[in-house]
């Protein structure tokens, strides 16, 4: 693949490649995760949950849940489409509410941070308009699974990193209040 930036070849003919189509990633050699990445929710679910709960008093959890879900120190591996899908599957959760409050009142959020990525990975992962999934996956199953992200019936805003955050339009007034109170930028 032209997007494989680093390749390791084995004697048996197999290859391990670092593929980064959109050039968001980086790779550092080492024996452990870097200090700014928490436990993987799909393979270290107990450690993942513990890491969040033991740090819930930190200032980072004062911010809206839709922003905190992108913090890899606590939500390792949760990216843009996964945060939209996780929050959408919690219809009573205002995605602009303080993360600490959301997590304390809705422990299912932490569970979904494990369940949703596992399901997405089992389906082979997503595909974007500018990136075709190289794994021969059932595109229709993944498209059915994605209910919120990039759905024209949903609302969206840009987060502090300039990424589109897709959310249920029932929360649009909450989004506008955040703008009025200068808590997020339009």
Predicted regions and their residues:
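Residue-identity detector for threonine
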Residues: 14-15, 32, 42-43, 101, ...
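Acidic, proline/glycine-enriched N-terminal capping motif
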Residues: 1-38, 103-104, 165, 171-176, ...
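Basic, nucleic-acid-binding surfaces and adjacent catalytic neighborhoods in DNA/RNA-processing proteins
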Residues: 54-186
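A short, charged helix-loop
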Residues: 22-60
């Amino acid at each position: 693949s032209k997007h494989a930036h680093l390749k390791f070849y084995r004697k048996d003919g197999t290859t391990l490649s670092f593929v980064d189509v959109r050039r968001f990633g980086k790779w550092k050699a080492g024996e452990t995760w870097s200090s700014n990445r928490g436990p993987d929710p799909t393979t270290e679910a107990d450690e993942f949950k513990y890491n969040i709960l033991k740090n819930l008093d930190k200032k980072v959890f004062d911010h809206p849940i839709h922003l905190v879900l992108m913090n890899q120190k606590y939500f390792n591996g949760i990216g843009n489409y996964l945060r939209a899908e996780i929050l959408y599957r919690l219809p009573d959760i205002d995605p602009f509410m303080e993360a600490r409050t959301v997590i304390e009142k809705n422990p299912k959020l932490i569970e979904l941070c494990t369940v949703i990525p596992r399901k997405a990975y089992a389906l082979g992962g997503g595909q974007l308009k500018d990136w075709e999934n190289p794994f021969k996956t059932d595109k229709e199953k993944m498209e059915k699974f994605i209910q919120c992200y990039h759905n024209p019936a949903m609302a969206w805003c840009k987060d502090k990193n300039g990424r589109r955050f897709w959310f249920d339009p029932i929360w649009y007034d909450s989004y506008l209040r955040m703008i009025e109170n200068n808590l997020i930028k339009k």
